[in-house]
Regions:
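Glycine-rich, Arg-bearing micro-motifs that act as flexible, cationic patches
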Residues: 14, 133-158, 173-175
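Gly/Pro- and small hydrophobic-enriched strand-loop and loop-to-helix capping segments
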Residues: 40-44, 167-173
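Short, hinge-like loop/turn segments at secondary-structure boundaries
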Residues: 63-65, 128-130, 153
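Small/aliphatic-rich secondary-structure junction motif
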Residues: 2-78, 100-105, 110, 159
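Eukaryotic short linear interaction motifs
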Residues: 25-26, 54-57, 62, 120-121, ...
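Structural beta-alpha unit
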Residues: 1-11, 34, 74, 80-85, ...
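Short, ordered loop/turn segments at secondary-structure junctions
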Residues: 50, 139, 169-170
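Short, acidic/small-residue loops that bind anionic groups at enzyme active sites
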Residues: 159-168
Length: 175
């Protein structure tokens, strides 16, 4: 499997999983740890979290989930700095949790976070870190919601400079 990934040579294949607070991101990370273990034991798995630019909400980590607080948009530099610091803390907490999960599976992980719109931040990180395979979870938005809001996975499939694997969580079967 390792030789099939990207255009790297030998053991320098770089795999990156882009995550957020969603269940589908957690599922994608677990899928990688269970299905690509041979590939990701040769070089560290890169885990990426995009920090949204400071806007009208503050996000902070709550275990594996997230809690969001909304506040009026203000041009006060203090608000912007506070919001960005909270986004950074959230990203670091999420990355540390993901790194612990990787360690519990015997996989070395390198964590990366950047500020920016998740769509472009992920693609920029792919280029910056010379990634050979990008893995994302699929959130499962419907056609209309995806058309209105856009889709990080769709954007990355079209714009990332490496192969992209979108991991779709299997639907729960009701007995």
């Amino acid at each position: 499997m390792a030789e099939a990934i990207g255009n790297g040579t030998g053991t320098d294949k770089k795999v990156m999983v882009a995550i957020d607070e969603s269940d589908c991101s957690h599922y994608a990370l677990m899928w990688v740890l269970e299905n690509l273990k041979d590939t990701i034991t040769k070089s560290p798995l890169i885990i990426f979290v995009a920090q949204p630019p400071a806007t009208g909400n503050i996000t902070f980590a709550a275990s594996l989930g997230v809690a969001r607080m909304y506040y009026p948009i203000s041009s006060t530099p203090g608000y912007v700095e506070s919001a960005q610091e909270n986004h950074r803390k959230f990203a670091v907490a999420l990355l540390e949790k993901a790194k612990q999960i990787c360690a519990s599976h015997g996989v070395e992980a390198k964590v990366v976070t950047e500020i920016g719109d998740p769509k472009t931040a992920v693609c920029d990180a792919v280029e910056k870190h010379d990634i050979n395979l990008l893995i994302l979870g699929e959130r499962g938005h419907g056609t209309i919601k995806r058309a209105i809001l856009g889709s990080v996975s769709n954007y990355c499939v079209q714009n990332a400079k490496c192969p992209v694997l979108v991991v779709k969580k299997a639907p729960v079967q009701v007995a």
